Amino acid sequence: MAAGLCACNDEYTFVPEYEVKLPTDTTINVTIDASTVYQTIDGFASSDAWDMEYVGKYWSTSNKEAIAKLLFSREVDDKGNSQGIGLSMWRFNLGGGSEEQGDASGIVSDKKERRVDCFLTSANGSYDWSKSAGRRYFMEKAKEYGCESFVLFSNTPPVYYTYNGQARSDKGAFSNLKTEHYGDFADFLATCAKHFVDEGYNITHISPINEPQYNW
């Protein structure tokens, strides 16, 4: 959902088409057996990867608010149409510092939206919580709309802790995290989680290894 919305540009106000056009003679029969249980779903989620940073930073306030409404609202209009999909979980990407590296990150320029900055500014443990402003905008909107659960996920450790100094492995199925920095990476995740908890976010999950060998 987020990816589809963010693929459009900011030259016009996005207006969703709520009413599905069906032939008048169409009949749809749906049978729901509430007694049959298949699984337990903890939440309905999406994430801010990848373009939400640019949308949150550079798009107009009206369009950003419209996107947030589509993602998080559970209200219905006077015709019974949902104002949004009512996400109950939001996944926030804890970047590793590839954005600060630019082309040196090894993430090619035509995929530069996949470069993500890092709250940790150096290996000595200093943090800059003003980073990822665009993605934090949507995280805040999720909270305002009543999103119950937030997941922090990481595609890479901070680049200070990796073998090749990048936010991607260049050796295929190979861990890029130096063994001597396992504890440092855990501290990074815990520090970020505590920060957002202190900011009023209900951090329910931490996913430290997300898509570890995706070739980007």
Residue ranges of predicted features:
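Bacterial Sec-dependent N-terminal signal peptides
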Residues: 4-26
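Internal metal/ion-chelating core segments
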Residues: 199-216
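Intrinsically disordered, low-complexity regions of eukaryotic proteins
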Residues: 12-13, 119, 213
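Boundary/junction segments of secreted and surface-exposed precursor proteins
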Residues: 25-34
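N-terminal catalytic cores of secreted or lumenal carbohydrate-active enzymes
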Residues: 33-203
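Proline-rich intrinsically disordered, low-complexity coils
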Residues: 16, 23, 157-158, 208, ...
